[in-house]
Amino acid sequence: MSCQQSQQQCQPPPKCTPKCPPKCPTPKCPPKCPPKCPPVSSCCSVSSGGCCGSSSGGGCSSGGGGCCLSHHRRHRSHRHRLQSSGCCSQPSGGSSCCGGDSGQHSGGCC
């Protein structure tokens, strides 16, 4: 039995060397998940109003992820709507909706 043990120690198994390849998929990890929130100054281009990414940008007064009227993109929409800086504070379907001067659900939801 001592001979068999010495032979096993002398002969390394061939499965140990190619076990881990030198090339690991590390660069695929960082770009796996894109940022959840868009830039503060960017709003979605909706026909009636855009969605704000933050409460401090785009003239949105509701807290995080509310909808506002894209008053800075008035040249894009030919229809002249009431450009108020107020947002709908009442969530509809888990998200705030854009509205007119009174905050009615007349715009898109985010």
From Swiss-Prot:
InterPro entries: LCE. Residues 96-110 have a biased composition (Gly residues). Induction: By UVB. GO terms for cellular component: cytosol. GO terms for biological process: keratinization. It comes from the Eukaryota. Transmembrane segments: none annotated. Keywords: Keratinization. Residues 1-23, 83-110 are annotated as: Disordered. Skin-specific. Expression was readily detected in adult trunk skin, adult arm skin, fetal skin, penal skin, vulva, esophagus and tongue. Not expressed in the cervix, rectum, lung, colon, or placenta. The keyword Disulfide bond does not apply. Residues 1-10, 83-95 have a biased composition (Low complexity). Residues 11-23 have a biased composition (Pro residues). It holds the Pfam family LCE. Belongs to the LCE cluster present on 1q21. Precursors of the cornified envelope of the stratum corneum. Belongs to the LCE family. Interacts with CYSRT1. This is Late cornified envelope protein 1A. The gene is LCE1A.
